[in-house]
């Protein structure tokens, strides 16, 4: 579940 967490984190961080 690292990919899912990383993806969400990346989007939130980028936003």
Curated annotation (Swiss-Prot):
GO terms for biological process: hydrogen peroxide catabolic process; response to oxidative stress. It comes from the Eukaryota. GO terms for molecular function: heme binding; lactoperoxidase activity; metal ion binding. GO terms for cellular component: extracellular region. Its main location: secreted. It catalyses: 2 a phenolic donor + H2O2 = 2 a phenolic radical donor + 2 H2O. Its cofactor is Ca(2+); heme b. Binds 2 calcium ions per subunit. Keywords: Calcium, Cell wall, Heme, Hydrogen peroxide, Iron, Metal-binding, Oxidoreductase, Peroxidase, Secreted. InterPro entries: Haem_peroxidase_sf, Peroxidases_heam-ligand_BS. Its EC number is 1.11.1.7. It is found in: Secreted; Secreted, Cell wall. Ca(2+) binds at residue 10. Heme binds at residue 9. Disulfide bonds: none annotated. Removal of H(2)O(2), oxidation of toxic reductants, biosynthesis and degradation of lignin, suberization, auxin catabolism, response to environmental stresses such as wounding, pathogen attack and oxidative stress. These functions might be dependent on each isozyme/isoform in each plant tissue. Belongs to the peroxidase family. Classical plant (class III) peroxidase subfamily. This is Peroxidase 2. It comes from Cycas revoluta (Sago palm).
């Amino acid at each position: 579940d690292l990919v899912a967490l990383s993806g969400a984190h990346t989007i939130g961080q980028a936003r």
